[in-house]
């Protein structure tokens, strides 16, 4: 019984190798017998080689499974000529993956002007401490010019707008104003309580910006992604009273810098400007507290 089973198994192997007793064995046929069975038609064989990129995880246009033997199934329709690489077939079976909209170019002219304004801030502080008010007034005029050009370019050229710029512009203003107010307070040109109020508000706003950046960052949150200027997650919208407050603060700085040059440091109008600046600073802080989420626009893919 055992011998009969062995004989049947040997006959099956010989038959699969395409030769039987009494025929001349072929080494080529014996080798092909060890390979997987060949598809039932040449169309299936060609389709199997055509689908190899899909097995490797690649997404190529117009590749779909077909069965030439049964005739079932049809290839996915190819895109029309001239549709471009941005078009995509149903199901996302072709075309390159789209670039995330969160990435943007940070090297715009307004952003460079904001960085210039940040760089001028310590220079102005040094000139004020050294009581070189004539040069300080000229450098401050240059910093103010960069602020005006920054906003003008961003409003009139859409390709110069960026989410980074919406945060970098007010950040540059706050750094410039904070250094100027500390320096002018050191020079006894601005009272200490007013400087304390302005810096406290700016510190809270900067902390809020960092918090919003963390909260709007998609998971996994990494330091490289957090500090990547090209990866924008939110766009900030300052309130109207905040814009007015920034203008009033800069006017007070200009008036204080010019006071020792034109000898009106004890003017009553300068003191009225101190009080008005304190009022707009408090109103600006309250506006951010009141509107909160309305000042932040989250950017999504």
Curated annotation (Swiss-Prot):
Alphabetized Pfam families for the sequence: CDP-OH_P_transf
Family membership noted in the UniProt record: Belongs to the CDP-alcohol phosphatidyltransferase class-I family.
Tissues where this protein is expressed: Highly expressed in tissues such as heart, skeletal muscle and liver.
Keyword Transferase among record annotations: yes
Gene Ontology molecular function: any one: 2-acylglycerol-3-phosphate O-acyltransferase activity
PANTHER family documented for this protein: CARDIOLIPIN SYNTHASE (CMP-FORMING), CDP-DIACYLGLYCEROL--GLYCEROL-3-PHOSPHATE 3-PHOSPHATIDYLTRANSFERASE-RELATED
Entry GO CC: mitochondrial inner membrane; mitochondrion
Region (Disordered): 70-93
Record field: pH dependence: Optimum pH is 8.2.
Native species: Homo sapiens
Cofactor: a divalent metal cation
Chief localisation class: mitochondrion
S-S pairs: none
Subcellular location: Mitochondrion inner membrane
The name this protein goes by in its record: Cardiolipin synthase (CMP-forming)
Disease: Combined oxidative phosphorylation deficiency 57: An autosomal recessive mitochondrial disease characterized by multisystemic features including encephalopathy, neurodevelopmental regression, ocular anomalies, decreased vision, auditory neuropathy, sensorineural hearing loss, and cardiac defects. Disease severity is variable, ranging from premature death in infancy to permanent disability in young adulthood.
Gene Ontology biological-process annotations: cardiolipin biosynthetic process; phosphatidylglycerol acyl-chain remodeling
Transmembrane region(s): 109-129, 133-153, 190-212, 250-270, 272-292
Superkingdom field: Eukaryota
Record field: catalytic activity: a CDP-1,2-diacyl-sn-glycerol + a 1,2-diacyl-sn-glycero-3-phospho-(1'-sn-glycerol) = a cardiolipin + CMP + H(+)
The protein's role, per its UniProt record: Catalyzes the synthesis of cardiolipin (CL) (diphosphatidylglycerol) by specifically transferring a phosphatidyl group from CDP-diacylglycerol to phosphatidylglycerol (PG). CL is a key phospholipid in mitochondrial membranes and plays important roles in maintaining the functional integrity and dynamics of mitochondria under both optimal and stress conditions.
Documented EC number(s): 2.7.8.41
Bias (Low complexity): 71-93
Broad EC category: transferase
Membrane topology category: Multi-pass membrane protein
UniProt entry keywords in alphabetical sequence: Disease variant, Lipid biosynthesis, Lipid metabolism, Membrane, Mitochondrion, Mitochondrion inner membrane, Phospholipid biosynthesis, Phospholipid metabolism, Primary mitochondrial disease, Transferase, Transmembrane, Transmembrane helix
